[in-house]
Amino acid sequence: MEFKVIAEYFDKLEKISSRLQLTALLADLLSKSDKTIIDKVVYIIQGKLWPDFLGYPELGIGEKFLIKAISIATNTDENSVENLYKTIGDLGEVARRLKSKQQSTGILGFLGTTSKESLTVDEVYSTLSKVALTTGEGSRDLKIRLLAGLLKKADPLEAKFLVRFVEGRLRVGIGDATVLDAMAIAFGGGQSASEIIERAYNLRADLGNIAKIIVEKGIEALKTLKPQVGIPIRPMLAERLSNPEEILKKMGGNAIVDYKYDGERAQIHKKEDKIFIFSRRLENITSQYPDVVDYVSKYIEGKEFIIEGEIVAIDPESGEMRPFQELMHRKRKSDIYEAIKEYPVNVFLFDLMYYEDVDYTTKPLEARRKLLESIVKPNDYVKIAHHIQANNVEDLKSFFYRAISEGGEGVMVKAIGKDAIYQAGARGWLWIKLKRDYQSEMADTVDLVVVGGFYGKGKRGGKISSLLMAAYNPKTDSFESVCKVASGFSDEQLDELQKKLMEIKRDVKHPRVNSKMEPDIWVEPVYVAEIIGSEITISPLHTCCQDVVEKDAGLSIRFPRFIRWRDDKSPEDATTTDEILEMYNKQPKKKIESPAVDESV
């Protein structure tokens, strides 16, 4: 299969703003792709060489070295490449222009032909894999030579998307939900297959693997798919409520209540002597927690399992729980074993999804928890999450206050009974979180996606000082604007913000973004931030839940304030539009709706 086919589709996809058209065009590409390499095609569409959970290196070529590779491939002076980049602001477009110029002035162009050996998807994939995996002395020069070799063979359009792929900025607006829908159309005969494919993806979060199973064994093979150790399951998510009485009522008056820890959610896989740890975002974080690997090996019985829990920082002297931020030191420190001594952790387990070749996601919580409790040996490091079974509001409240006093964020209330299965990848009422009140009218913080930025005035002039934030709508796989946040940032965070946003800046609005408000710059929906506000109000300026509460108006957060970045969350893990609506409906209503803040000033 020629790489040119993918490049031509990417070129079309980049110009489309309708998700329906995007999905249809992507389905067309998948149906025309070589079935023997369909997994590689899917990964390339996702903008990666392999799933994040494998923990393999990324391409690791910076802007400076890309410029050098383009310079070598197009026989152009490096300064000229750099100057053109400063003018255009897109290295992919720089490569396209220089290749076009080279093509028209070269001997083949002079003879009226551009015939050359075609660049194949296999060649692109294998070469870029070498680029990513090459390490050691002289590796940087080898990476540049390998990439320059690809760019030399590429035509202008191929060069454009090769460079963008290496940069991690394909800019074609494709999310996983869009790929799932396109796969249903291309391989399953239509949207009716979406549920089957989505279920399989929730159990094995590897779209390339799912596509390969479909083309080799058919859509029916997905119906019997089980979790596989080494491929993360998409985590089950909770709804939120701030009223204990209402929560217990939702649960039918009886529930298991766990501490909600202020740590890092972790999915732990074991097969024989191999242990993997995956984050909430399904990234391989095993290298950050060699101590946890050791604890699991020693204290959890079983040859093959997938369990879930929270890794929590512990004060080495008092044994008390420390906040989530303490775990960040593990990512920053070069000496992980020194970090283990300074920032020790405990693991609090709360679920079991797979054990000794049996899929437990379809079994009720009580059965899962009973087995989990039976396989944990007595020890000081890996424990079952603190929990009670509550059948009255007083017990729920008392346990909630105890969780808060011991450093937790609140509690997770979980349904029991035969229908209380593990809903992989779904947010539902089987789990409800009750978090502490932040002494504002909003009962909880929200996690929102940055989709744009605004330049400041006065001492902040010329710098991005406020952000356009959006909630995620899983039904349309889009991000709907909900507020403009300007407070809560330190000077250091504002300085860091400039660099963050300039790296993901776009010329036009991303096709997955739905916003009436026009920021000074648009950005890729990549970063997630935790936001608090005074209340949720009706706003004609924002598109979150547009026309749901009031015609021609959406919902907005009044007086929003930045709390922290949520690097542990992907954009699709952000607070959903339905959750924003639920929070709005749960607010104490005033006789007259609070006026929306005029965020245009």
Curated annotation (Swiss-Prot):
The keyword 4Fe-4S does not apply. Ligase activity stimulated by PCNA heterotrimer. It is an enzyme of class 6 (ligase). It comes from the Archaea. The active site is at K260 (n6-amp-lysine intermediate). CDD domains: Adenylation_DNA_ligase_Arch_LigB, OBF_DNA_ligase_I. Pfam families: DNA_ligase_A_C, DNA_ligase_A_M, DNA_ligase_A_N. It catalyses: ATP + (deoxyribonucleotide)n-3'-hydroxyl + 5'-phospho-(deoxyribonucleotide)m = (deoxyribonucleotide)n+m + AMP + diphosphate. One of its GO terms (molecular function) is metal ion binding. Signal peptide: none annotated. Keywords: ATP-binding, Cell cycle, Cell division, DNA damage, DNA recombination, DNA repair, DNA replication, Ligase, Magnesium, Metal-binding, Nucleotide-binding. Its cofactor is a divalent metal cation. Gene3D superfamilies: DNA ligase, ATP-dependent, N-terminal domain, DNA ligase/mRNA capping enzyme, Nucleic acid-binding proteins. ATP binds at D258, R265, R280, E310, F350, R427, K433. Its EC number is 6.5.1.1. GO terms for biological process: cell division; DNA biosynthetic process; DNA recombination; DNA repair; lagging strand elongation. DNA ligase that seals nicks in double-stranded DNA during DNA replication, DNA recombination and DNA repair. Interaction with PCNA enhances ligase activity. DNA polymerase I, DNA ligase and the flap endonuclease may be constitutively associated with the PCNA heterotrimer forming a scanning complex able to couple DNA synthesis and Okazaki fragment maturation. Belongs to the ATP-dependent DNA ligase family. Interacts with the PCNA heterotrimer, probably via subunit PCNA3. This is DNA ligase. It comes from Saccharolobus solfataricus (strain ATCC 35092 / DSM 1617 / JCM 11322 / P2) (Sulfolobus solfataricus).
